[in-house]
From Swiss-Prot:
One GO-annotated biological process of the protein: translation
Residue span of region Disordered: 103-134
GO function term, MF aspect, one: structural constituent of ribosome
SUPFAM superfamilies: Ribosomal protein S6
Native species: Geobacter sp. (strain M21)
UniProt GO cellular component terms: cytosolic small ribosomal subunit
Assigned protein family: Belongs to the bacterial ribosomal protein bS6 family.
Annotated gene: rpsF
Name of the protein in question: Small ribosomal subunit protein bS6
Length: 134
């Protein structure tokens, strides 16, 4: 049964373009060789790591999305683990197709203050004064 997966892997930041292209081709070949359906490969660029990994304070991130089965995940992770250029990787199964949420409408500052004042007026109880004659 084919399921959708995504893998993020981090490589050493000092790799050249040819080495990165060879690694990306190798990853795509693993997916194709195991009858997977390759969807997307994105280069997220070099970023600072939360903590140094193998004395590297930075890493180059790659995002991979594909359809396949559990055997494909096992083989892909095995190949990433054996490659010295890859310093970390993580694969997860996606439940459904991920859709970006729609942006919330932005209110201007004047509209926001008027709405807050209107809400405060409706929520606050009206002050009543009673006069008592003696």
């Amino acid at each position: 049964m084919s399921r959708m997966y995504e893998t993020i892997y981090i490589v050493q930041p000092d790799l050249g373009d040819e080495e990165i292209k060879a690694l990306s081709t190798k990853v795509q070949d693993v997916v194709a060789g195991m009858n997977g359906d390759f969807k997307r490969l994105e280069d997220w660029g070099t970023r600072k790591l939360a903590y140094p990994i193998n004395k590297n304070p930075r890493g180059r991130y790659f995002y991979l999305r594909f359809d396949g089965d559990s055997g494909l995940i096992a083989e892909l992770e095995r190949r990433l683990r054996l490659d010295d250029k890859v310093i970390r990787y993580q694969s997860v199964k996606l439940e459904t197709e991920v859709v970006a949420p729609a942006a919330a409408p932005v209110k201007s500052a004047e509209e926001g203050t008027e709405e807050v004042a209107a809400e405060a007026a409706t929520e606050a109880p009206a002050e009543t004064t009673t006069t008592v004659e003696v």
